[in-house]
Amino acid sequence: MRIFIIKSSTAHTAFDYSIKDIPGTSGRLDLICRSLNAAFQLSHSFRKNVRVYTVLYGPPDPPKTIRFEGAKIKPKTLNPDEVSTAKLIGKILNAGKDIKEPTKEREVLPGIYISRMTFEDVVRKNIKYNLYLLEENGVDIEKVKFPQDNVGFILGDQNGFTEEELNFLEGLVPKITIGPKPYLTSHVIAFVNIYLDRIGIP
């Protein structure tokens, strides 16, 4: 299984944004929509071997974490276009309005869950799955020997990670990179998926 943990410092945590202007009103939730597309969508099929956590820290009610389980998501629930994905995320956020317990997940749709887990909670929960932090100054991905069972990747948004978050991750997960420049999160996910396909990692 492949796991992607995407932390957004700005994406809204309530359905208070306009579908007509997702980038301008949602705290760059469009980045999350494109990342989900890159994680799951193939030309004529859907990746069932992928799990994605989107950890949202934008206003008005952070944190909110949405977990997407590719193996359980029903066909046509998660589509390639940003608008339908933004609507879906809005529906999920509405369903999680009244969640109080920090780590209790609520299944909103088959394979899609919402909780109040923090970024640190999500990392700790998945640390057994061989996590890697994707950063420009990491080890070249081509030099990494990945395990054949489960592997996970931690990615930031347009703002990256706070110093506190980097300190938390230091020594906990190794840093790797796909290249020397700051790439779009969705492009990094697409590259990682293609690279793992090429080297035969499930």
From Swiss-Prot:
GO cellular component, one term: cytoplasm
CDD domains assigned to the protein according to its UniProt record, in alphabetical order: TrmY-like
Coiled coil: none
Main localisation: cytoplasm
Binding site residues for S-adenosyl-L-methionine: L134, G156
Keywords: Cytoplasm, Methyltransferase, S-adenosyl-L-methionine, Transferase, tRNA processing
GO terms for biological process, alphabetical: tRNA methylation
Subcellular location(s) per record: Cytoplasm
Phosphoprotein listed as a keyword: no
InterPro entries linked to this entry: Alpha/beta_knot_MTases, TrmY, tRNA_m1G_MTases_N
Cystines in this chain: none
A Pfam family assignment: Methyltrn_RNA_2
Protein family (similarity comment): Belongs to the methyltransferase superfamily. TrmY family.
Assembly behavior: Homodimer.
Protein name: tRNA (pseudouridine(54)-N(1))-methyltransferase
Name of the gene encoding the protein in the UniProt record: trmY
